[in-house]
Amino acid sequence: MGDKWIGAALSDPLRILASPLVILRRDDDTKTLENIESLVKTHQPDLLIIGLPISLNGTIGPQAEKVKSFSELLSRHLNIEIIYRDERFSTDEARRKMNDSGKNNKTVRDDAAAAAVILQDYLDETNPPCCQP
């Protein structure tokens, strides 16, 4: 969640695969809340996974505090659980995946792809493999 853009991603119903959904322009908190509320009403997620921009040294800096403040407002407004995930290197991973898939980074914004990376990390961590040998 940046100051100008918010990437959104969804998982499949089985919570196995995350996919980029949309990129929202972040104009002001009221408009941003309305846009996210519309997505939540449409897709009815159980919870929201929010990328937290933790500093490279592992500390919570001013940008992460801004994200947490807005996320708390979002949670109260939508009455939905928020789970924070470290978003360090998610954009780099998203760009690598887009490049590997042949998508041109100049024409595709990477915010939603980074959101999918963050969500996929959460899904992989919380869902054990379905089939153990």
From Swiss-Prot:
GO terms for molecular function: nuclease activity. Pfam families: RuvX (PF03652). Could be a nuclease involved in processing of the 5'-end of pre-16S rRNA. Its main location: cytoplasm. This is Putative pre-16S rRNA nuclease. GO terms for cellular component: cytosol. InterPro entries: RNaseH-like_sf, YqgF, YqgF/RNaseH-like_dom, YqgF/RNaseH-like_dom_sf. SMART domains: YqgFc. Keywords: Cytoplasm, Hydrolase, Nuclease, Ribosome biogenesis. One of its GO terms (biological process) is rRNA 5'-end processing. Its EC number is 3.1.-.-. The keyword Hydrolase applies. The keyword Signal does not apply. Belongs to the YqgF nuclease family. It is found in: Cytoplasm. It comes from Dehalococcoides mccartyi (strain CBDB1).
